[in-house]
Amino acid sequence: MTAVRIAKAEDKKAFYDLWKICFGDSDAFCDWFFRNRFAPDYSVVLETEGKIVSCMQAFPYTLWIRGREIPGAMLCGVSTHPDYRKKGYMGQIFTYEMKLLREKGCLVAPHTPAVLQSYFPFGHFPVADAAYLTCDG
């Protein structure tokens, strides 16, 4: 049986482990991220047979748009364990997450997905181009 629910603080290790499996980021980054950005009350999990196999994180994020403060949540870490992919789990957690964020009053949900096209079936499309600038020194 599968069930989608709001994450709990005690799910942090499962989120961390799934992030490492799916994205391969360094321990230093993951440690920082989960210490500073993990917000279980803004995140969702999908469990099957009592095991978290898919999750989506978000954390509160305020944007300034045309001089107005807009409440939102930054989406990140949408992940499904490789053994459980192609079962429609992303669609289930995405739908649940969007409902949760609406209930929390979030008007925008920006994200920087590793695979941008994976968000298209759920109605999330780019609204602006981005440029990354670096400087020496």
Short names for language-model regions:
Residues 1-60, 67-74, 137:
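Short amphipathic alpha-helix that is part of the acyltransferase structural core
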Residues 44, 53, 76, 114-116, ...:
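Core nucleotidyl-transferase/polymerase catalytic module
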Residues 61-63, 83, 116:
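Short coil/turn motifs at secondary-structure junctions
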Residues 75-85:
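A short, internal acetyl-CoA/4′-phosphopantetheine-binding micro-motif in the GNAT/acyltransferase core
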Residues 84-96:
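Conserved acetyl-CoA pyrophosphate-binding loop and the N-cap/start of the following alpha-helix
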Residues 89, 107-108:
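Extreme N-terminal leader/targeting regions
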Residues 102-107, 113-131:
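Conserved active-site alpha-helix within GNAT-family acetyltransferase domains
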